[in-house]
């Protein structure tokens, strides 16, 4: 059925953009509320389309905890996006071109549909070989990116990777992880013998006027892996309120009970939220506690940050 597309390559994006410029396309439905789906929502809003987002889960952006994804949902609703949560697509209808999307809860008019429901490893060609695959089809590699067959390497979204915090293998389909692993695999093919130091699932997204970032473990992951943990949420500003145009930042911190070792962090704000996640990523990578990061010598100047940065306000509030 024409008018139903996936967004996988640059060519896909160019084609869809030109298609969406047609005046008869007024209603766009996005299926999937992850990173790609949300970016599509914003793109079509900028093109003046009426946008509907259908998500099978009870919220969007599930890599973030509920408090943060809730802020993203509020931002989308404020810009006129129709959110259809807890709904599953049943079928697309139309003659030649899509005209309607049917879910388990209703029917919606649509002249264009984008399916953005995540990715899975395309490794079917390895079935029946000696290369070990995980349950989701991802290639299992050691920390040198070597598969179960000696001297055969793999890297990218087709693989599991070592998670720095949990010490377990994880499926993290992120460009940063793929680039690092690809570089390391190439070096090891040439005899470098280097090990991947581990990923944290650090990621960021722009949601209209908000920016959001996360790193390390979310609350659900901390519980899943058996951590004894605590959380705290603070609201601060990107720079001091006495300097013009301060904007609010919300930070959620997940840390180990007792030791106060930082396990994960998430941030949301209009400006300056995402880059603060990089500070937390370095801290988690090196096993820092909230006390240590809370007293780290970060920069101060009124245009950029306060004497106590939002990162440190969160850390020092952790008990």
Q: PLM ranges: what are they?
A:
Residues 2-24, 100, 107-184, 283:
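FAD-site-proximal beta/loop scaffold in flavoenzymes
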Residues 6, 30-31:
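Hydrophobic Val/Ile/Leu positions in short beta-strands of Rossmann-like dinucleotide-binding domains
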Residues 16, 26-27, 50, 228:
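Residues that mark the start of a beta-strand
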Residues 23-24, 132-136, 192-203, 228-232:
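A short alpha-helix-loop-beta-strand transition element characteristic
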Residues 27-29, 35-91, 173-178, 195-196, ...:
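Rossmann-like dinucleotide-binding cores of NAD(P)H-dependent redox enzymes
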Residues 45-143:
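A Rossmann-like FAD-binding core segment of flavoenzymes
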Residues 141, 155-218, 303-319:
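A conserved FAD-binding loop/helix module that cradles the flavin
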Residues 209-215, 223-319:
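Flexible, glycine-rich terminal cap/loop adjacent to redox cofactors
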